[in-house]
């Protein structure tokens, strides 16, 4: 049964209820020198600055926000509040914009004012910040970043927003569920209409789960680590035979992931001490399982092994290795089987990061900067090949909420063309009897099923394997084509990772 997502109602650090005070965080104390000149508090200002950078410079919130918090010395509850404001506002933007439009008599808003209003709407509709504090601090923020002129407008609009809760507003501003169910879900769950349609298509016969899938995309994801095999237990390459048995000792601030024997879910959410020492990388559990699936498939021995060449199951390839999470897991497992992984990425800087990550983990790197479509090695060189291809990232909207507003349906065909080329090159790199794993962080059928079936049919020298059977311990992997495995956040608590396994004949 699908896990129904519950709405997040975080206690906001710096809000009157969170702080136990009627004074909003960051506002001056009575009698202080600046008491007559209210300024935006640091947490709200940090969230605003990230929103503007996302809009103006195409910045990534997950990269910019931690650096900004460190630069401004925000820690503890202030950092947590800034994080909630940033990600919550980005996730809910579509819904908030529809509500703000209903509360404003202006056809267009200046972008800075609009972001102030979005932050205010999120506080009013999705956090425990009190109404007075949410409105007053938004007015202070508007004065700080836009000057005094729009403050009255911000005050009036947010007071209108505060007259109803989120569910009541949704019923007013969303299209009728009966007349336009796609439009209703798009507004209710803050996803562009085309993404709602893409998810419905990907769910296929399970389309009744669509609302659960969209709601899960708005939940805050856990921080999950993939620990390099051999770093924690000294047993490189030995995946436990019993999937119920975890391969690693579990530290007190973590819990094992449900299915990956190398996954740890952090309670505290700070992975720095593990990542810096080379013990682990941040990696979603579904991504770990996709890499593990490649290592589980039995190989057909080569018909005519070349004299002097490494024998059966000795050469593995990660074709699109950056930023290196799957490469670390594969390299650790390969070392335990007397095999060696070659990691390749088209961008030299990403290839360099993969090399550094492998070295930190104590692994001998074999890293190549090369376009995966035009590889420098001979055809048939590798026994196992991972093609974790560039994609629309529609499967990781929990982690990159701004991506839903940047991607367009017009970009998908060009991505699919590159994906077909990369899968073709991956198959060409595998020897006869070797195995290829095709992986995307998107459930869009044009990037998943359609790519694999088109390449397989055109080539005629590959067999599509039963991927869900290889990951038999994981329930609910069925996709529109039963040979493929599709993870979903509402079913598995993971990103929406797609996996196909192919054997070259």
Write out the residue ranges for each language-model feature.
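S-adenosylmethionine
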Residues: 1-505
């Amino acid at each position: 049964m699908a896990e129904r997502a519950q709405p997040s109602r975080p206690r906001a650090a710096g809000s009157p209820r969170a702080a136990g005070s009627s004074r909003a965080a960051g506002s001056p104390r009575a009698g202080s020198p600046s008491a007559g000149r209210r300024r935006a508090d640091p947490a709200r200002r940090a969230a605003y600055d990230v929103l503007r950078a996302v809009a103006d410079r195409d910045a990534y919130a997950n990269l910019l926000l931690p650096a900004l918090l460190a630069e401004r010395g925000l820690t503890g509850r202030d950092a947590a509040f800034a994080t909630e404001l940033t990600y919550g506002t980005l996730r809910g933007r579509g819904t908030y914009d529809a509500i703000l439009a209903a509360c404003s008599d202006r056809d267009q808003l200046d972008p800075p004012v609009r972001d102030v209003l979005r932050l205010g709407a999120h506080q009013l509709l999705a956090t425990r910040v009190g109404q007075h504090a949410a409105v007053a601090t938004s007015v202070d923020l508007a004065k700080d970043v836009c000057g005094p002129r729009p403050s009255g407008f911000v005050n009036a609009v947010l007071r209108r927003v505060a007259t109803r809760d989120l569910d009541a507003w949704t019923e007013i501003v969303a299209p009728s569920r009966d007349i336009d169910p796609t439009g209703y879900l798009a507004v209710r769950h803050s996803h562009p209409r085309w993404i709602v349609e893409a998810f419905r298509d990907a769910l296929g016969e399970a389309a009744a789960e669509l609302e659960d899938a969209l709601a899960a995309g708005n939940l805050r994801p856990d921080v999950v680590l993939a620990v390099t095999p051999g770093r924690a237990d000294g047993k490189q390459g030995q995946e436990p035979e019993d999937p119920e048995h975890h391969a690693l000792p579990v530290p007190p601030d973590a819990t094992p992931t449900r299915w990956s024997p190398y996954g740890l879910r952090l309670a505290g959410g700070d992975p720095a001490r593990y990542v810096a020492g080379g013990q682990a990388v941040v990696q979603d559990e579904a991504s770990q399982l996709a890499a593990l699936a490649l290592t589980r498939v039995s190989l057909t021995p080569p018909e005519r092994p070349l004299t002097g060449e490494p024998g059966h199951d000795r050469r593995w390839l990660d074709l699109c290795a950056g930023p290196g999470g799957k490469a670390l897991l594969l390299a650790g497992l390969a070392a335990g089987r007397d095999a060696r992984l070659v990691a390749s990425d088209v961008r030299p800087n990403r290839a360099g990061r993969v090399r550094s990550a492998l070295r930190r983990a104590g692994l001998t790197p074999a890293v190549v900067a090369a376009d995966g479509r035009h590889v420098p090695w001979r055809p048939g060189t590798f026994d196992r090949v991972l093609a974790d291809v560039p994609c629309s990232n529609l499967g990781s909207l929990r982690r990159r909420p701004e991506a839903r507003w940047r991607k367009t349906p017009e970009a998908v065909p060009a991505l699919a063309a590159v994906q077909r080329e990369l899968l073709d090159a991956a198959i060409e790199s595998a020897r006869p009897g070797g195995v290829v794993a095709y992986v995307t962080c998107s459930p869009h059928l044009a990037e998943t099923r359609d790519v694999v079936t088109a390449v397989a049919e055109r080539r005629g020298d590959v067999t599509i394997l039963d991927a869900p059977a290889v990951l038999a311990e994981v329930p609910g992997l069925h996709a529109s084509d039963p040979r493929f495995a599709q993870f979903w956040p509402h079913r598995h608590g993971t990103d929406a990772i797609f996996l196909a396994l192919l054997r070259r004949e």
